[in-house]
From Swiss-Prot:
GO terms for molecular function: nickel cation binding; unfolded protein binding. This is Urease accessory protein UreE. It comes from Burkholderia lata (strain ATCC 17760 / DSM 23089 / LMG 22485 / NCIMB 9086 / R18194 / 383). Belongs to the UreE family. The gene is ureE. GO terms for cellular component: cytoplasm. Involved in urease metallocenter assembly. Binds nickel. Probably functions as a nickel donor during metallocenter assembly. It holds the Pfam family UreE_C. Residues 171-207 are annotated as: Disordered. Residues 180-194 have a biased composition (Basic and acidic residues). It comes from the Bacteria.
Amino acid sequence: MRTLDKRIAPNVKLAASLVARAPTLTLAYDARCKSRLAATLDTGEDVAVLLPRGTILRDGDVLVADDGALVRIAAAPETVLRVRAADPLTLMRAAYHLGNRHTPVEIGDGYLKLEADPVLADMLRRLGTQVEETLAPFQPEAGAYGGGHKHGHDATFAEDYALAQQVFGEHHGHAHSHSHSHDHDHDHDHDHQHGPGCAHGHGHDHH
């Protein structure tokens, strides 16, 4: 069994004819988020995918097998929610609430697209959007926080929301209490002051 263990950087331009001759590995979004999996090429050949942890494959990516051959990644059609609204403000509000939940979202011209989730579908309808379940490839925006993706009903939602609020507070100078002592060393050489604009990188407990 061949192993696909390298991804060619997106900024590396390959000859179109070379990519066109490469066999295709068609994967849904969940599978493209896995750095290690057994998969089957569209030719029927079984392969192993072994990539650095945290790798998320996108439609059009090119992988290199351990024998030097190329394999092209394609996004498989899957069940998704296509979200539209009568006005841009309503769609922006929907995007804001999805972002608060760290939900992977594909942003298109006049629509949002996300994985099918009944909890999120209900929330989006309550916000005044039109939600349509359809079958289509899913290509969400790259995440700002990293890590796995979350659904509206995940038990970790409260933790994610707290993290988002913490990051927001640190980068916008919001005052907050500190429950830990500040006797640790800092690797910068300027005075360390805890004023309203404090935005240092260690975690804070919020009360």
